[in-house]
Curated annotation (Swiss-Prot):
Segments for region (Interaction with target base in tRNA): 95-97
Gene Ontology MF, one: tRNA binding
Feature type site, description Interaction with tRNA: H125, Q344
HAMAP family reported in the protein's UniProt record: tRNA_thiouridyl_MnmA
One of the record's GO cellular component terms: cytoplasm
Protein's recorded name: tRNA-specific 2-thiouridylase MnmA
Reaction catalysis annotation: S-sulfanyl-L-cysteinyl-[protein] + uridine(34) in tRNA + AH2 + ATP = 2-thiouridine(34) in tRNA + L-cysteinyl-[protein] + A + AMP + diphosphate + H(+)
Compartments reported by the entry: Cytoplasm
Disulfide bonding pattern of the chain: C100-C196
């Protein structure tokens, strides 16, 4: 009887390594595939590609599977990084890991795996796939503290039907135990953090290599200039560190936060205090939508939503756009949400089931009547 072939995306980390081992133990014909998605820093201090490949080969030798490397750097630059720069240039804060999953790991990678004769692909993501009544559902991981369904919400039925997440039912602590028990050479390797192509390097330094600085005024809600920014692209809503402002003598003395960007005047608005009304939103509008089931929830449906990773699901009401052909949606939250950021993803849930979501275009904050005379700075609007 021919074994079912599964191609596992292997990064050199513990999660994907244990994924490959588990599937091999379950009797699958496992092939490891290492993706190289970034080439600009092959010799830089922050590039770990060479060591990651060495770790992949070592793990493959130990568990007895074939492994190969594939270069998706061109696809990544075209489908992910170019959009990343466009969004930052427009003053928004994108999440490239969401786009990378949809366009690279579960599209380019999936296509390549099928060319190798695979019936299924698998990754080390913490999430689950469930088939019900002929449809595939994306669910949160058993270990909610490690759940990554937020980053996977743009996957469609075709992609989910060919995907396995073996770690979805396993706590992260158990994954580490398995790695140590079977003697994986990377058992103590730290989890990767940060945006995949940036790694551990200072984000502002990285962004400055691709986007020019464009200094402008930094103002308070009443129009007072309190400093100068280096360029709107280098700041995000709710940001506290790196603003360059201490507590002012005539202010509250509380920390400063980025609260709004006025693209037309190149002005960055800052406020003092974590609970300032400019940082709180009860409503948002999102576009560029993607629904796991292929269609949105019913108008007025109750659901939970995340506007950032690791955020607890916030109860809200879902609203469809009134105009025919407009796929955007609105969310009205039961409680104000903090620093809802244009460019980030609003992801909807029905319990553990991820419904999909969209890219945040705008959010209504408590700013009425507080803007400088003659101009109320609007949150950045997506195209």
């Amino acid at each position: 009887m021919t074994k079912r072939r599964v191609v596992v995306g292997m990064s050199g980390g513990v999660d994907s390594s244990v994924t490959a081992w588990l599937l091999k133990e379950q009797g699958y014909d496992v092939v490891g595939l290492f993706m190289k998605n970034w080439e600009d820093d092959d010799d830089g201090e922050y590039c770990s590609t060479r060591q990651d490949w060495i770790d992949v080969v070592s793990v493959a030798d130990l568990i007895g599977i074939d492994v190969e490397a594939v270069n998706f750097a061109a696809e990544y630059k075209d489908r992910v990084f170019a959009e990343f720069l466009r969004e930052y240039s427009a003053g928004r804060t994108p999440n490239p890991d969401v786009l990378c999953n949809a366009e690279i790991k579960f599209k380019a990678f999936l296509d390549h795996a099928m060319s190798l004769g695979a019936q299924t692909i698998a990754t080390g993501h913490y999430a689950r796939v469930r088939e019900r009544d002929g449809r595939f559902e994306l669910l949160k991981a058993f270990d909610h503290t490690k759940d990554q369904s937020y980053f996977l919400h743009r996957l469609n039925q075709a992609q989910l039907s060919k995907t396995m997440f073996p770690l979805g039912e396993i706590p992260k602590t158990r994954v580490r135990e398995i790695a140590a028990q079977i003697g994986l050479p990377n058992a103590k390797k730290k989890d990767s953090t940060g945006i995949c192509f940036i790694g551990e390097r200072p984000f502002r330094d990285f962004l400055n290599r691709y986007l020019p600085t464009k200094p402008g005024p930094m103002k308070t809600p009443d129009g007072k200039t309190v400093g100068k920014h280096i360029g709107l692209a280098f700041y995000t809503f709710g940001q506290r560190k790196g603003i360059g402002l201490g507590g002012s003598k005539d202010g509250s003395g509380e920390p400063w936060f980025v609260a709004a960007k006025d693209i037309a005047s190149n002005t960055l608005y800052v406020v003092q205090g974590h609970d300032h009304p400019w940082l709180r939103s009860r409503e948002l509008v999102a576009g560029n939508v993607s629904w796991v089931a292929g269609e949105p929830p019913a108008d007025g449906a109750r659901c939970g939503a995340k506007t950032r990773y690791r955020q607890a699901d916030a109860p809200c009401a879902f609203g469809r756009a009134a105009q025919a052909g407009d796929e955007r949606f609105s969310l009205v939250f039961d409680e104000p949400q903090w620093a809802v950021t244009p460019g980030q993803s609003a992801v909807l849930y029905d319990g553990d089931v991820c419904l999909g979501g969209g890219i945040i275009e705008s959010a209504a904050t408590g700013r009425a009547g507080t803007a400088p005379a003659g101009r109320a700075p609007a949150l950045v609007e997506a195209r």
